[in-house]
From Swiss-Prot:
Gene Ontology biological-process annotations: defense response to bacterium
One function term, GO molecular function aspect: toxin activity
Record-annotated WAP domain positions: 21-66
One CC-aspect GO term: extracellular region
Lineage start: Eukaryota, Metazoa, Ecdysozoa, Arthropoda, Chelicerata
Homology family: Belongs to the venom protein 11 family. 01 (wap-1) subfamily.
Keywords in alphabetical order: Antibiotic, Antimicrobial, Disulfide bond, Secreted, Signal, Toxin
PTM field: Contains 5 disulfide bonds.
Subcellular location: Secreted
Disulfide bonds: 24-54, 32-58, 41-53, 42-80, 47-62
This protein's name: U15-lycotoxin-Ls1c
């Protein structure tokens, strides 16, 4: 009986990890001078290793997702270009 309870608890723990929502981390930067805005990415495909393209006041950068909301994913689109944006 104890092994069944353990198996159920283990399964629930695994599912909560797999099914938990993921978000871009909240940026610690609140403002940026226009001449310092630089996009390292425009979409998630521009990032490596499972990181996402996240929008910050200083441009889009690749960051690993977190389980805490607050950040914003980059919108991308045809007008998005990598490099300095000015």
């Amino acid at each position: 009986m104890n092994s069944k309870i353990f198996a159920v608890l283990l399964l629930l723990a695994f599912l909560s990890c797999v099914l938990s929502d993921q978000y871009c981390p909240k940026s610690s930067i609140t403002a940026c001078k226009k001449m310092n805005i630089r996009n390292d990415c425009c979409k998630d495909d521009d990032c490596t290793g499972g990181s996402w393209c996240c929008a910050t006041p200083c441009g889009n950068i690749c960051k690993y997702p977190t389980d805490r909301p607050g950040g914003k994913r980059a919108a991308g689109g045809k007008s998005c270009k990598t490099g300095y944006v000015y």
